[in-house]
C-alpha cells in the first residue's frame, strides 16, 4: 500500500577535519513543475549527485518522481563535501514516494556513492563516520561492501554491506537478509605480517644504529649527514622495525587519519604497523603540512605515530621546512581557512638526511665545493628547526671491509626488545603525566628527571658558549 507522506529524513555524516558530524538528509517531494533543488551548503560533488541519483533510481527498476524535489542537508551552516550522500538522497526519495517506511530508515546511518547503474561505491572517511555513528547511539550503518572492513573495526555497531541500491531497498523492506560484517581489531594487530627490511641488513655504521636505537627508545628526532651511499635511507627505512607495536587506540587513531585520506588498507580496514612516510623534496607546504580549500591531512599527519623521513633535507623549500616547526613542537598542526580551522594530529619522529654538500662528494678530501658553498648548503636548515632535532649524526662512507663481510648486525627483533624495555621504564616514570616518552618532556620534567653532575654542567656550559646553543637546544641535550 502506498504511503501518503511526501517528506522523508535519512541520516548520514560528513567529514570535518579528522572527525565526523551527523547530517540529516531531508527530502521533500511536492506537486509542481519537475525540479531537483539541493540546499544546505553542498559542494560540487553533492550538487552533481542529482544526475547520479536520477539514473541510479531508474536503472535499478524504480520510478523517479517527476515532481518538485527539494533536498536539504542539515545543519545548513555545515559545509559538506564528497559523493557519500548519493545513497541517503536516493533512499530519501524512495521513502518520500512511499516505497520505504520511514521508521526503518531511523535505525541506520547511510553512506555511499552511486554509479549510474545503481552500484554502491566506497567512499573515504568511513572510519570517523562509523565512530560518530556509535557515539550518537545509532544501531547500524549501511554502506558499500568495500567500506565494510574499515567500519567493522568499530565495536558495537552493526555494519551492513549492500552492493546495489536495489539490495538496500530490499533489505529495508524486509525482503532480503544481510548478515553484519564483524572484525576483531585485536586479532588484526596481533597478526604480524613480518618486516620486509631488517637492521641486520645494514653493513657498518654501528654508531648510527646505536643512535637510532636511542631515538626509538625515547621518541627523538634525528638528522643524518653523510655522503651518498653511506646508508642514510637504509637506516631510516628500518627505524619503524624497532619501534613498539601500535596499541589498539593508536591503531584506530592512525587509521582515522588514513581513512580521511582514503589510504586505509582495503583488506584489513585498520592500519596495523607504524607509518613510514617519505615525501619527495618537491612536495609543497600544503602536501607536507596539510591544507586545501577544505583542509585535508598532509604527510606530517599521515606519519602520526610513525616516522617521517625527509631525504635531501636542505633541498626542501624554506617555507616547507619552517612549517615543520609547529608540529615538531606541539604534536599537531592547525590548518586555518575562512570557513574555520581544523586540527590534525602530527606526533611523529622526524628523520632527516642530507649530503655534506650540494654535489654529494664522497669525502671531504674529494669535495670540489668551497667551504663557503658547503656552509651555504647546510645553512638552509635554520637554527630553530635544528633546535627541535635531538640527535645530529655524521655518517662516514661505508668501507670495503664492511661491505665484503656478511651481515654482522643485530636483527630488528633483538633491538626492539631493548626499545620496549626502555619504553616500559618511561611509562612508569611518567605514569602521572600525559607524557609518554623522553622526547615529550617539558621544562619542569627535564629539571626533575635530568639532573647532571657539576662536571657535566661545566661541559654543557662550554658547549652552549662555543656552539651558540639556545635554551631549547640546552633542553634537548638534557
Would you name each region that the model predicts?
Residues 45-50, 65, 72-82, 295, ...:
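Basic, amphipathic alpha-helical bundle interface domains used for macromolecular binding and assembly
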Residues 223-268, 330:
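Walker A/P-loop
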Residues 213, 269-275, 283-308, 340-341:
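Conserved alpha-helical scaffold flanking the Walker A/P-loop in AAA+ ATPase domains
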Residues 305, 311-313, 323:
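Walker B catalytic acidic pair
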Amino acid at each position: 500500500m502506498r504511503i501518503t507522506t511526501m517528506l522523508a529524513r535519512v541520516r548520514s555524516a560528513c567529514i570535518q577535519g579528522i572527525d565526523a558530524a551527523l547530517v540529516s538528509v531531508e527530502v521533500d517531494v511536492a506537486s509542481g513543475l519537475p525540479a531537483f533543488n539541493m540546499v544546505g551548503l553542498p559542494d560540487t560533488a553533492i550538487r552533481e549527485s542529482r544526475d547520479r541519483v536520477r539514473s541510479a533510481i531508474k536503472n535499478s527498476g524504480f520510478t523517479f518522481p517527476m515532481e518538485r524535489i527539494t533536498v536539504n542537508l542539515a545543519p545548513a551552516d555545515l559545509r559538506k563535501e564528497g559523493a557519500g550522500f548519493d545513497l541517503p538522497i536516493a533512499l530519501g526519495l524512495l521513502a518520500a514516494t512511499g516505497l520505504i517506511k520511514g521508521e526503518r530508515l531511523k535505525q541506520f546511518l547511510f553512506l555511499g556513492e552511486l554509479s549510474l547503474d545503481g552500484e554502491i561505491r566506497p567512499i573515504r572517511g568511513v572510519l570517523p563516520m562509523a565512530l560518530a555513528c556509535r557515539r550518537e547511539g545509532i544501531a547500524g550503518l549501511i554502506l558499500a561492501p568495500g567500506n565494510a572492513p574499515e567500519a567493522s573495526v568499530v565495536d558495537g555497531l552493526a555494519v551492513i554491506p549492500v552492493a546495489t541500491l536495489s539490495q538496500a531497498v530490499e533489505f529495508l523492506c524486509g525482503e532480503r537478509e544481510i548478515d553484519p560484517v564483524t572484525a576483531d581489531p585485536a586479532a588484526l594487530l596481533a597478526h604480524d605480517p613480518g618486516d620486509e627490511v631488517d637492521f641486520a641488513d645494514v653493513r657498518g655504521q654501528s654508531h648510527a644504529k646505536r643512535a637510532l636505537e636511542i631515538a626509538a627508545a625515547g621518541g627523538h628526532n634525528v638528522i643524518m649527514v653523510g655522503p651518498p651511499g653511506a646508508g642514510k635511507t637504509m637506516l631510516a627505512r628500518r627505524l619503524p622495525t624497532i619501534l613498539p607495536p601500535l596499541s589498539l587506540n593508536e591503531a584506530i587513531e592512525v587509521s582515522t587519519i588514513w581513512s580521511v585520506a582514503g589510504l586505509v588498507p582495503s583488506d584489513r580496514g585498520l592500519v596495523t604497523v607504524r607509518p613510514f612516510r617519505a615525501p619527495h623534496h618537491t612536495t609543497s607546504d600544503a602536501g607536507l603540512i596539510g591544507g586545501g580549500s577544505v583542509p585535508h591531512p598532509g604527510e606530517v599527519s599521515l606519519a602520526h605515530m610513525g616516522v617521517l623521513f625527509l631525504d635531501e633535507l636542505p633541498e626542501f623549500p624554506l617555507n616547507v621546512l619552517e612549517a615543520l616547526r609547529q608540529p615538531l613542537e606541539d604534536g599537531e598542526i592547525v590548518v586555518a581557512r575562512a570557513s574555520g580551522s581544523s586540527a590534525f594530529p602530527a606526533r611523529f619522529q622526524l628523520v632527516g638526511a642530507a649530503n655534506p654538500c650540494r654535489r654529494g662528494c664522497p669525502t671531504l678530501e674529494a669535495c670540489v665545493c668551497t667551504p663557503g658553498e658547503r656552509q651555504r648548503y647546510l645553512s638552509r636548515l635554520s637554527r630553530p628547526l635544528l633546535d627541535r632535532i635531538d640527535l645530529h649524526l655524521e655518517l662516514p662512507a661505508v668501507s670495503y671491509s664492511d661491505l665484503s663481510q656478511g651481515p654482522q648486525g643485530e636483527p630488528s627483533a633483538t633491538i626492539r626488545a631493548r626499545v620496549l624495555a626502555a619504553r616500559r621504564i618511561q611509562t612508569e616514570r611518567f605514569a602521572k603525566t600525559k607524557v609518554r616518552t623522553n622526547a615529550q618532556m617539558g621544562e619542569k620534567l627535564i629539571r626533575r628527571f635530568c639532573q647532571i653532575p657539576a662536571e657535566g654542567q661545566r661541559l654543557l656550559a662550554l658547549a652552549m658558549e662555543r656552539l651558540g646553543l639556545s635554551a631549547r637546544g640546552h633542553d634537548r641535550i638534557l
